Amino acid sequence: MLAANQSAISQTCISDDDLTKLPGKFTDHKWTPAGGHTSSYSAVEQTLALKNLSSIETNFVKYFWGDGTNGKASFGFSEGNYFNNLFLGQYSFTVGFYELICKDGNIKTAHEFGTDFKITINPFIEPGLNINGRGRQYDFSVPGNRKNFSNTINLFRYMIFSNKEEPEKINSGNSYIESKPIYHDAYDKHPDVVRNWYFAPAGKMILIEVTRKEYLESLLEFYEREKPGLLKEMDRLIAIDKSTLKLYEKEKDGKSKKDYDYFLNRIKEYETDRQRYENAYKTKKDKVTSLLKSNAESWLNEPAVLSKEVIMGSYCRSGSLKEYEETGCFSFNDFVSIENGYTVYKWNPDLFKQQPATSPAFIKVSLRYKSGIELSEKIRDYYTKNLDFTFIKSILNKK
C-alpha cells in the first residue's frame, strides 16, 4: 500500500476495497507550476507550448476516468532534442493516478502514484540499439541552430531498433508498442509496463530508412573526426612522459634507472599506438571509399542493413574483437540482407523541416501501469479503449 499524505477526503471507510468504485476525481494542472526546463524556452515558445497543453487537458477532461483514484494533471518541459538539424522542444501533459486509501477509517489520497497517462509533444525515441560515441561524444559534436545546445555528427543521429516491428508501428500510429516489464528491485512483484502510441501529421512518416550511401558517408565523417582526437590524446600522453623523463635525466642516482626505463618504454608504446591509429584510419577509410566508388547508384540507394554481430557486439559496432583490435571503432566490411540484420533509420526530413521550437511535429501517448494490480490495469484498459486519437491527430494537422 502506498504511504498516505495528510490531505483527506471528508468521508469514512472500513477498507481499501470500499474505495475502488468511488468515482475518480480530476485535478487540473493549476495545482502545481509547470515543471522541468521552462527556462530553456523563450516567452513566445512557452506560450505556444502551454496553449497546446491546455487544449490537450480540456479534451482529456471529457473522457477522464479513474475510479478509486485522484487524477492530478501537470505540465512539464524537457530540454528538447535535435531531429536531424532541427531543434524541437519537448513538453508534456501528465495525469498521475493517486490511489485512494483507507487509513484509520478515513479516506486519504496516496502521495505516490504508479499509474500515469502522458501525452508528449516532440518526444525523443530510444530504440535500444542506438549508435553512440562510446563516451567520446565531445569529439563528434557539431554546432546546432539552438544557442548553447550542440548537435552531433550524422552517424550518432541514426537509430537501430532491437524490435524490428517498432519502426512500422511508430510510423503507422495504428497500434501501441508495449515495453518489457521494468522491475525496480529483485522483490518487485508488480513491475511497471508502458504502452506507447506515436502520431504524425496525416501522410507523414516519423522515421525513414538510411541509405547505404548515407551510412557509408557518415562513417567517413566519423573517421575524419576520430583520427585527430586519438592522435591528440597520444601526443598528450607522450608529452607528459617525456617531461617526466627530463626530471629523471637530472638525477645522477642509478636507483632511478628502473623508473626511467618504465617511462621510456611507455613512450614507445604510445608511439606504436599512434602509428596504429594512423594505419587504422587509412584501412577503414579506403574500405568505405572503395564501396562508395565501386558500386552502382542503385546499390547505394538501398536501405542500410547491418549484421547482428555489428549491432549486438560491444566493440564500437565492429564485427568482431579481432577486427576491432586491428582497426578500431566502426570498422566496416559490408551490408547484409534484411533477413539477417537490422535496418538503420533516421528522422524523416520531410517532417522535420524548419518550424518554431515548440511547434508540435509529432506526438507520443504513453500509459504506464503496474502489472498485476487490478486498479492499475483497469485504468490501462479504459484508456487503451477510449483514447481520443482523432483529437490528438488534430493538434498536428492544424499546424
Predicted features along the sequence, with ranges:
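Surface-exposed amphipathic alpha-helical segments
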Residues: 11, 365-399
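Short, solvent-exposed recognition patches
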Residues: 36-354
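Compositionally biased, low-hydrophobicity segments enriched in charged and small polar residues
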Residues: 9, 355, 362-363
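Acidic/histidine-rich, surface-exposed loop or edge segments in extracytoplasmic proteins
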Residues: 24-39, 359-373
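Short N-terminal segments immediately surrounding and downstream of signal-peptide cleavage
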Residues: 11-34, 390-395
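Bacterial Sec-dependent N-terminal signal peptides
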Residues: 1-12
